[in-house]
Amino acid sequence: MSLSVAEKSYLYDSLASTPSIRPDGRLPHQFRPIEIFTDFLPSSNGSSRIIASDGSECIVSIKSKVVDHHVENELLQVDVDIAGQRDDALVVETITSLLNKVLKSGSGVDSSKLQLTKKYSFKIFVDVLVISSHSHPVSLISFAIYSALNSTYLPKLISAFDDLEVEELPTFHDYDMVKLDINPPLVFILAVVGNNMLLDPAANESEVANNGLIISWSNGKITSPIRSVALNDSNVKSFKPHLLKQGLAMVEKYAPDVVRSLENL
């Protein structure tokens, strides 16, 4: 979205005022309306599609394969494609790296939940396609991954768990599936405008923001990584430490409501 100098000044003053006035009438902690559809890709173990009110859209597919975890200890892999961006574009590589770090960290996905036997485990592939995005897409992607993983079903093991002394591959039931029992982390993005923090900034809010903040949430608490991110190329400034505390407190207060909403799909 391209705003004139006068529009930027008016919008910035509105967002930086006390209380802040957002163009769409949202309170500082409120998210844009979204639609989420799950389990719609028949060839995947789990899937989700999320559409935001501004037309941003993201699809996530979850697939799995059986690996020897003594040979391959990375049991989760995230790949991100963003329409209109090269695979080696900075924004794609940054988001891919962030999501891999969040999901593979100690507070991320518990790899023991993927273990089949003493020798074999499931490896989960998370494929993300951002069809359109009008603002920073990391929160939208995070919500889509959360919904897809929570709708994932894996084949039911019927062979023995102890297979270290017996050379046999895991055997699965022909029809029965087991729901993947994990608690995926979430990633929130906030905009810093003056002395105010705004959750889920829209495109026009991002254009006038002084800075951005990415905060991760897992298992009922804030976790690493926490990092700043530039939401535009022309208005980036440093921010004071008390704004970081304000952003952390906002996520800590409202993240449980987001988790409950996503779990009730």
UniProtKB/Swiss-Prot annotation:
Cellular component terms (Gene Ontology): cytoplasmic exosome (RNase complex); exosome (RNase complex); nuclear exosome (RNase complex); nucleolus; nucleus
Signal sequence extent: none
Localization of this protein: Cytoplasm; Nucleus, Nucleolus
Superkingdom in the source lineage: Eukaryota
TM helices/strands, residue ranges: none
Family: Belongs to the RNase PH family.
Quaternary structure, from the entry: Component of the RNA exosome complex. Specifically part of the catalytically inactive RNA exosome core complex (Exo-9) which may associate with the catalytic subunits RRP6 and DIS3 in cytoplasmic- and nuclear-specific RNA exosome complex forms. Exo-9 is formed by a hexameric base ring of RNase PH domain-containing subunits and a cap ring consisting of CSL4, RRP4 and RRP40.
Protein name listed in UniProt: Exosome complex component RRP42
Provenance organism: Saccharomyces cerevisiae (strain ATCC 204508 / S288c)
Encoding gene (name): RRP42
